[in-house]
Regions:
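Short, small-residue-rich loop/turn micro-motifs
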Residues: 1-4, 97-99, 165, 251
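A short, flexible beta-alpha/helix-coil linker loop
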Residues: 4-8, 100-102, 168-171
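Auxiliary Fe-S-binding modules of radical SAM enzymes
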Residues: 152-156, 166-306
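Radical SAM/AdoMet-radical enzyme domain recognition
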Residues: 14-37, 46-164
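Conserved G/P- and acidic residue-centered "switch" motifs that form tight phosphate/ATP-binding loops
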Residues: 42
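Canonical Radical SAM [4Fe-4S] cluster-binding loop centered on the CxxxCxxC motif
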Residues: 1-17
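Short, flexible helix/strand-to-coil boundary loops that buttress conserved ligand/catalytic motifs
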Residues: 1, 82, 109, 251, ...
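Short, solvent-exposed loop/turn segments at secondary-structure boundaries
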Residues: 10-13, 106-110, 173-177, 263
């Protein structure tokens, strides 16, 4: 979080609940979406999130299945809503946690709320939901010394930790590929104290490379998302819908289509399907981070959704 904060999206620009549900319905019943993830920004800021999840869980795809529903959150206030989210139909959850040290957490988030995040993690564990994944971005000179402590914290609680290479989006001038902590660096640091074996689980379209991990009597899995050094673009099947109704075919895309504007100008469901499909078909072969002509997206991560 920049010291000066981020620009808040004006409320009239944000999709209404009915608009969100309409587009999610189209994605599931017309476009073949089988997994829906609510992310952000911070999805828990939406007081009606449980209602949207409930409506999503009631949808039926053409093959008779219901969509899998996941949530990515910073965990603030999660302890008070976890039960209701599960009751609404939430299947899986990812919680962002970049540090176990209060001062480091504060410097990264500009909030003295680490205890609230940990309470949210405890609430997720108590709810019985599985899997619970912890998302951690490792940054040089900030939290690279917490790679092993975070891994032990998660393994001892039955959580699946996912380390993520810092990407050139929302990082601005602080991102330098030559200085970034790579997936190889992370695996090297882990291997000094934790036993790692490549997982035999099929990766499919998942972004993380999985490792079986163990230390003392604790066993589990650790994932590493090497979006910069080992791009997985060829296996990516995601489409992103922003809070203000723009559809994007890549996290790093600079092109997007406003389904919100189409809806508010009377578009039919068929019109929306056609626009969404066209955007998906325009997906590039790769994100291009490692190309000399790469252009960093103008939207921050909080305005796109991870």
């Amino acid at each position: 979080m920049p010291e000066e904060g981020l620009h808040w999206m004006p409320t009239p620009d944000v999709l209404t609940d009915d608009e969100v549900i309409r587009l999610v319905t189209i994605a599931v019943t017309r476009l073949g979406a089988r997994s829906i993830r609510f992310t952000g920004g911070e999805p828990l800021l939406r007081k009606s999130l449980e209602d949207i999840i409930s409506a999503t869980s009631s949808l039926t795809a053409s093959d008779g299945s219901h969509p899998s529903i996941a949530l990515t959150t910073n965990g603030l206030g999660l302890d008070k809503r976890m039960h209701a989210l599960v009751q609404a139909g939430l299947d899986r959850i990812n919680i962002s946690l970049d540090s176990l040290h209060p001062q480091t957490y504060f410097s990264l988030s500009r909030r003295d709320r680490l205890d609230s995040v940990l309470a949210g993690i405890d609430a997720a564990i108590a709810s019985g939901i599985s899997p619970i994944k912890i998302n951690t971005v490792i940054m040089p000179g900030i939290n690279e010394n917490e790679i092993v402590p975070l891994a032990k914290f998660c393994l001892s609680r039955g959580l699946q930790l996912r380390f993520i290479e810092q990407m050139p989006i929302g990082a601005g001038r602080n991102w330098d590929k030559k200085e970034m902590i790579t997936a190889e660096d992370i695996i090297g640091a882990l291997s000094k104290e934790i036993s790692l074996t490549a997982s035999s689980q099929p990766r499919g379209h998942a972004p993380a490379e999985l490792w079986k991990a163990s230390y003392d009597d604790f066993h589990g899995h650790i994932g590493v998302i090497a979006a910069v050094t080992k791009p997985f673009c060829a296996g990516c099947d995601r489409t992103r819908l922003t809070a203000d109704g723009a559809v994007r075919n890549c996290l790093f895309a600079n092109e997007e289509v406003s389904l919100r504007d189409l809806m508010r100008h009377g578009a039919t469901d068929d019109d929306l399907v056609a626009a969404w499909r066209l955007n998906a078909w325009d997906k590039k072969r790769g994100h291009g981070i490692n190309q000399t002509d790469f252009i960093q997206p103008t939207r921050t991560m909080s305005a796109i959704g991870g």
